[in-house]
């Protein structure tokens, strides 16, 4: 009886071991599959991260290249815009200079007519009512011409008694003078004109060679005494300030 029980227990133990072994055999492939799947997922994540990093680097490089191209194009645009603006200003100046030159040339042709009017006015002495009427009409015509020149910006120079300036005057004659010192203009021979501050025609003049007015000894002494008094007054005022 005891032998039968022992045999039965052994059979049960063997059966349990077989069940456990069977369960272990069933679990092992599943665990291997899970482990392999995890490794595959990790590899996929690493590949995706590497691809993302590579794409980021490519984008940054492309962005840097585009920024350089943009800066180059902007610099070219600024340079072209500046060149065009300078060209426009230069064209405007050239046009203004051309207009002024044409105006000067035209007025220079008219000025001799004005000179003839002025000479005639100085020389003609009308006698009789008819001659006086003609003279008045002639003067009115001269006045109209002068008014037109004024509207265009033409102004005559006033040179007598002024210092000679080669940028404004042309010396046709030089002679000694006791009335004016050296290089002072004695007489206007041909009138000069300005056009809006620019010399339209140089004045042709007679220039003094001196010596100028003589100073009497008495006048000279009075002048020296006056200057001495002024120096004394200045010294006194300076001392008072101190």
UniProtKB/Swiss-Prot annotation:
<keyword id="KW-0143">Chaperone</keyword>
<dbReference type="InterPro" id="IPR013805">
    <property type="entry name" value="GrpE_coiled_coil"/>
</dbReference>
<dbReference type="GO" id="GO:0042803">
    <property type="term" value="F:protein homodimerization activity"/>
</dbReference>
<comment type="similarity">
    <text>Belongs to the GrpE family.</text>
</comment>
<dbReference type="InterPro" id="IPR000740">
    <property type="entry name" value="GrpE"/>
</dbReference>
<dbReference type="GO" id="GO:0051087">
    <property type="term" value="F:protein-folding chaperone binding"/>
</dbReference>
<feature type="compositionally biased region" description="Polar residues">
    <location>
        <begin position="1"/>
        <end position="11"/>
    </location>
</feature>
<dbReference type="InterPro" id="IPR009012">
    <property type="entry name" value="GrpE_head"/>
</dbReference>
<dbReference type="GO" id="GO:0006457">
    <property type="term" value="P:protein folding"/>
</dbReference>
<feature type="region of interest" description="Disordered">
    <location>
        <begin position="1"/>
        <end position="57"/>
    </location>
</feature>
<dbReference type="GO" id="GO:0000774">
    <property type="term" value="F:adenyl-nucleotide exchange factor activity"/>
</dbReference>
<comment type="function">
    <text>Participates actively in the response to hyperosmotic and heat shock by preventing the aggregation of stress-denatured proteins, in association with DnaK and GrpE. It is the nucleotide exchange factor for DnaK and may function as a thermosensor. Unfolded proteins bind initially to DnaJ; upon interaction with the DnaJ-bound protein, DnaK hydrolyzes its bound ATP, resulting in the formation of a stable complex. GrpE releases ADP from DnaK; ATP binding to DnaK triggers the release of the substrate protein, thus completing the reaction cycle.</text>
</comment>
<dbReference type="GO" id="GO:0051082">
    <property type="term" value="F:unfolded protein binding"/>
</dbReference>
<keyword id="KW-0346">Stress response</keyword>
<protein>
    <recommendedName>
        <fullName>Protein GrpE</fullName>
    </recommendedName>
</protein>
<dbReference type="Pfam" id="PF01025">
    <property type="entry name" value="GrpE"/>
</dbReference>
<keyword id="KW-0963">Cytoplasm</keyword>
<feature type="region of interest" description="Disordered">
    <location>
        <begin position="208"/>
        <end position="242"/>
    </location>
</feature>
<dbReference type="GO" id="GO:0005737">
    <property type="term" value="C:cytoplasm"/>
</dbReference>
<comment type="subunit">
    <text>Homodimer.</text>
</comment>
<feature type="compositionally biased region" description="Acidic residues">
    <location>
        <begin position="216"/>
        <end position="226"/>
    </location>
</feature>
């Amino acid at each position: 009886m005891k032998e039968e029980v022992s045999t039965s227990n052994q059979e049960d133990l063997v059966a349990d071991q077989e069940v456990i072994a069977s369960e272990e055999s069933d679990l092992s492939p599943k665990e291997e599959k899970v482990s392999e799947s995890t490794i595959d997922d990790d590899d996929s994540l690493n590949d995706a991260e590497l691809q993302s990093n590579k794409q980021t680097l490519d984008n940054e490089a492309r962005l840097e290249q585009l920024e350089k191209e943009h800066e180059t194009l902007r610099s070219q645009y600024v340079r072209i815009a500046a060149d065009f603006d300078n060209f426009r200003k230069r064209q405007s100046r050239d046009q203004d200079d051309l207009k002024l030159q044409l105006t000067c040339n035209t007025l220079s042709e008219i000025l001799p007519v004005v000179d003839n009017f002025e000479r005639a006015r100085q020389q003609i002495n009308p006698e009789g009512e008819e001659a006086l009427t003609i003279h008045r009409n002639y003067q009115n015509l001269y006045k109209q011409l002068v008014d037109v020149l004024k509207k265009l910006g033409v102004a005559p120079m006033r040179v007598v008694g002024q210092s000679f300036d080669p940028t404004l005057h042309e010396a046709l004659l030089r002679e000694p003078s006791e009335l004016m010192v050296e290089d002072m203009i004695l007489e206007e021979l041909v009138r000069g004109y300005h056009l809006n501050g620019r010399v339209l025609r140089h004045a042709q003049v007679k220039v003094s060679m001196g010596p100028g007015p003589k100073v009497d000894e008495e006048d000279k002494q009075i002048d020296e005494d006056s200057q001495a008094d002024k120096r004394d007054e200045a010294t006194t005022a300076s001392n008072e300030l101190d």
